[in-house]
Amino acid sequence: MSENSFHRSDRPRQRVVITGMGAITPIGIGVEAFWDALVAGRSGAARIAAFDPAAFPTQIACEVKNFDPNSVADKKEARRLDRALLFALGASAEAIKSAGVDPTKVNGDRCGVVIGSGIGGIDTFEKQLHILFDQGPGRVSPFFIPMMIIDMSAGLVSMKYGFKGPNFATVSACATSGHAIADAVRLIERGDADLMVTGGAEATITPAALAGFCSARAMSTRNDEPERASRPFDVNRDGFVMGEGAGIVILESLEHAVKRGAPIIAEFLGAGMSGDAYHLTAPSPHGEGAARAMKTAIADADLTPADVDFINTHGTSTDLGDICETEAIHSVFGEHAGKVVCNSTKSMIGHLLGAAGGVELITCLKTIQTGTIHPTINLENQDPKCDLNYTPNTAVKRPVRVALSNSFGFGGHNVTLAVGAYQRNGGR
């Protein structure tokens, strides 16, 4: 048994499977559109359209395009909801439909929702703040607080489908979705729920958020070449590109999924969490915290490093982050590190912050389903300090049985999720 207390294979727990997926991303609305664009190596980066970015050092982002709010809520309700909430509703609807869940035929008391957001309704916050200062407090919307608070995605999804089981949100910056999914898994494993809707949603391409990240010098300023700006593990990377969207999955106990004849996409194998206790925004030296998260996920899944075929990296295109993650992978996998195939979804969709982990877990699931590993685009001159196989520029075909998804957030929050091909007589 691992010495890490989070490894619990000695305790009885139910097997957890993934039966549905939903995605709203800068390169496609819907899982299949998203996946096709990933495999094709298509970037979602462009000059910001939501507002005039001329005054900002960074003027580019990966915005969700052609999203119709009225496709997920009626016109009156859509006006009362923040963009992040609309993304959560849209991705959840796709996930529930793809899982074949009929809310009237499941026990709502045993179905729950855990959906997180790293920042929440900042677009609503900024707009209402302008109203407050320009028009006075009496003009602030009565829906301001419900539109803004992070837990409302979970609340709205539960209300829409009548899911009355565990219902809450997670907040851990860029690790938010990973923590939401890990928490949802634990609830099923210990018998507190049969089915969970989980993941994350984010919509932070706003003037204040952009200004804050620009002041932190965290983002790329390659404004003349937006499609080439996000370049994880490349020697010429100069920061991340902000994205937006949502990624939601349906988790079920194996027993519940089999009983209702659900389509089983993959099995959830393990989760690992750790804290850096080091710095507000920088990773711990040599990726020590990230390494502990990966080690714990592997142990929690009752696997060895040699069992892992693929890692969807956090891969943000920041100088220190990419190096530290590479060092962490070397630390965990040793000689096997060179045999593990990696990639970065953020090279195409940018950094979805609190929604990143949900969308990137879907990347892992599609990789297992299709045996295709999408490319890390813009990897033209690989950093010698980033010396792994990151699938540069062209997708490759390769069977993947076990995949890891890494998410690391400001504040030293680290989470790794392990998923694998479903085997009827499997288990840990």
Residue ranges and their predicted role:
Residues M1-I18, P103-G108, A301-D307, A337-G338, ...:
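Flexible, low-complexity linker/loop segments at domain and module junctions
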Residues S2-E77, A99, E255-E267, I362-T376, ...:
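ACP-dependent fatty acid/polyketide chain-elongation machinery
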Residues E3-R13, R47-G90, I96, R110, ...:
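Conserved catalytic cysteine-centered active-site region
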Residues R15-T19, S43-R47, D224-A301, F310, ...:
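Condensing-enzyme catalytic core mediating Claisen C-C bond formation in acyl metabolism
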Residues A88-A99, S153, A180, E252-L254, ...:
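Short, well-ordered amphipathic alpha-helical segments that serve as non-catalytic structural scaffolds
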Residues A95-N107, A257-I264, M294-F310, V332-H336:
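Phosphate/pyrophosphate-binding loops at sites that engage ATP/ADP/AMP, CoA/4′-phosphopantetheine
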Residues D134-S141, H179-A182, R186, L195, ...:
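Glycine-/small-residue-rich "gating" segment that lines the acyl/pantetheine channel
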Residues D192-D238, A271-P285, G315-I323, K339-N389:
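Acyl-CoA/ACP chain-elongation machinery
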